[in-house]
Amino acid sequence: RGKRPHSHRRVLLDRPRLLLPSEFTNACAFCADRYFDTPPEKSRLVKGLDSKFHIIEGLPAASMHDMVAEFRRIPNLFEIVSYDYWHENHNHYPTESQNRRMADYLASAEGYDHVLHVVKMRLEASGENHLETIPDDALLQYANGLFAGGHDVIVARRHYVDGATRTDQNASAGTLSVAEHRAYIGYTIAALKDLYNLNPAVKYVTAFQNWLKPAGASFDHLHKQLVAVDEYGVQIEAEAARVAANPAIYRQILHYVGHRQMMILGNDYAVGFADFGHRYQTIAVWPLGPALLPWEYTREQVDGISDVLHALHCAVGPAVPTNEEWYHRPVDLDVPMRFRILLKQRTSTLAGFEGSTRIYLNSVDPWTLRDEMVELLE
C-alpha cells in the first residue's frame, strides 16, 4: 500500500491560540507550578553551576521550588501495576529507606497536606464520594503506594519551548538540547535499573514515551514512563526464544538492513534505520557492539545512543505523535538479547480491515520513510 497519498498521515490537533504567560509553568499537572498535584518525587535532576546534571533525592515538600528541576522522577498517580497488586500478590512492603522517606515527608505540614491532597485526588478520580467524611488516618493508609510503587514517570521541565507564543509550540524530545537529551536518557536508565530492586518478583521493567494525546499521552508534556511487571510479556518471551534458537539473528537483521539500504544515520555507538514488520512506520535505534543491559554501557556509549535518538526526534518534529519503546534483556534471562529503542509515528489509524482480518497495513514503506528522514536530517 506504499503508493497511498500521504494526506491521511496529517494529524489534526487542537487549533492553536496565543499563550498566556502563566501557561509556561501551569499548563498541566506536570508543570512546575503544580508540583503538588503529582505524588512526592523520588528524585530530580538539576543543572549545577558546573553545567553538569546532578541527581537530588529526598527533598522535603517545602523545598520543592528551591531549585530548578530539569527532570523529575515521580510516581504515576494512576499506576498500570499498582502498589496494592504488588502487596497482595508478592507480599510487597516499603523498604526501611522508603518508610523513613515517608515518615520524614509526612512530618512537615507541607508534606502532610501534599500527601492527603494527592490521595484524595486519586480516590475522587476512582469515584469515591464524601471524601470530607474520611478521617486522615484512613486516607494515609493509601500513602504507601506513593513512596514504594513500581510505576514511575520521568517528567521534563518545559511544557512549551522557550520563547513560545502559541499553544502548538510544545517542548518535545527533539527540542531539548543535546546535553539535556543525554541527561534525560541517562536518568531514565538509572531509574530503569533501580526499579528492578522493587521486589524479587519483578521480571521486567518496561520503558516507553507517549508523545501527544493521539499517541496515548495524558498530557502534551514530555515524559517517559517506567513500569515494573511480574512477567516478561509476550514480546520478550517470543524474542528470547528466537535469539536462543538463532544467536546470530541480530547480526542477520543488520546485514539485511544494510543490504536493502534502510539505514538512516549512525555514529560510533549506535545506528538508526527504517524498521519493518510494525503496525506503524517505525525507526529503530540499535546500539553497536556487544549485547549489554542499558546500565552496562559507558557514559560515552549512552551519549552516543542518545544522540542518534535525539537526531531522529528532531527530524520527526514536535507535531507528530510518537511512541518511543525500549527493549532490553530481563536481568534473569541468560539470552544475549540486544537493548534497542523503537520510535513509532502514530499517524495512521487502525480500521475495519485490520480489525476484521488481523492483517495490519502500513502505507509507508521503509524506503519512503528512510528518504523522508534523511531529507529532514539534512
Task: Please report, for each region that a protein language model flagged, where it lies by residue.
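HIT superfamily nucleotide-processing domains
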Residues: 1-378
